[in-house]
Amino acid sequence: MKPGCSLFLLLFSAMLSSPPALAVEPLATTTAPYLLAGAPTFDLSISQFRENFNTQNPKLTLNEFRAIDSSRDKANLTRAASKINENLYASTALERGTLKIKSMQITWLPIQGPEQKAAKAKALEYMAAVIRTVAPLLTKEQSQKKLQKLLTSGKNKRYYAETEGAIRYVVADNGEKGLTFAVEPIKLALSENLDGSN
């Protein structure tokens, strides 16, 4: 018998006699917190948010949000988006039925050329305005500083989150593909370490 045939038969018989290989399941993708069952909502419907935003920021208006067909999570939420301009969008995840906000996002798609600086400045204005809408005690200057701190911490990170009070701030920096800034409510819980003494 030829050496090549012997090797083939040896490998073939070893393959048949060994236990079957089990498929390794890929690592679970992290689910965005607002997609989880029971995720909290802001106490604002999308219409109320838009009205508040536009009243507080007359030079930065949000157009009406349109529902987006998303079969992935239809049972839990409704997705909607509003085009601000060619490279800037607002999107939201809403609780099904109440249309209360689970996540409010501003996405900037970078453009090349001389208009890039102005386009980014406009995107940052919208992002800071979203912060002020959900945290109304912040001044314009404070919201801009907060945004800069978050963007610096989240630079070149696909996901960066920071919580303050009952709000989670999220930055998704995909470099040349775009930048998304989001605000999401979180559930606050009492510490279990309280000893009961007042």
Regions found by a protein language model. Name each.
Residues 99-102, 175-179:
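Residues at beta-strand starts and edge strands
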Residues 105-107, 168, 180-182:
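Ser/Thr- (and often Asn-) enriched beta-sheet segments in non-cytosolic proteins
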Residues 22-112:
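N-terminal leader/targeting segments
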Residues 93-152:
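Long, charged/polar, surface-exposed segments that mediate recognition or autoinhibition
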